Amino acid sequence: MKTTNRSGHYYTNSLWFSTAYLTLTLSSRNLLQILIAELKYKSVKSKDGARKIWTNNGEVSCTEAEFKLWTGACSSTYLKSRNQLIKHGFIKQTHRGGTHRGDRAKYEVLISANGISKADERWRDYPKKDWEHDIPKAKKQLIGRETQWKKGESGRKL
């Protein structure tokens, strides 16, 4: 991610004072801001005036290495922050990544550009509902399945 001097993102009061946002750790807030800074938008004219529409939402990403570079935190802090953002409903993973070199995990930020669309904003329901089941789990270890110890066996030689 490159730093830019383009305009920033303003949080609405409903987001800023929500239970979901106030219970985030500082590292989680930093990761959320990094993902929001990755978003690109275009202005669309409507009856109510100009509105922002994010064009690459669902395609934003931040790797552990980038997070460590920007914040000075460790890998486990990145994972805890990402998991907390998913649990609280601020982001949703759209692509797992990691299958080959250059394949990154991609996320969708669930905060509307103008603070108008409330239908997709999961964080509004946070205290009553969480999305812990959406947190990606490590895949089961399948290598060496046949050579592992069976029930009743031991490696002890008599």
Please describe what each predicted stretch is.
Residues 1-64, 114, 125, 157-158:
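Short recognition helix of helix-turn-helix/winged-helix DNA-binding domains
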Residues 1-3, 115-158:
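Charged low-complexity intrinsically disordered patches
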Residues 6, 29, 51, 82, ...:
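Arginine residue identity/basic-tract feature
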Residues 8-9, 19, 76, 105, ...:
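Intrinsically disordered, low-complexity segments enriched in small/polar residues
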Residues 35-38, 85, 147:
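A broadly tuned preference for mixed-charge, low-complexity surface segments
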Residues 41-108, 112-113:
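Winged helix-turn-helix DNA-binding recognition segment
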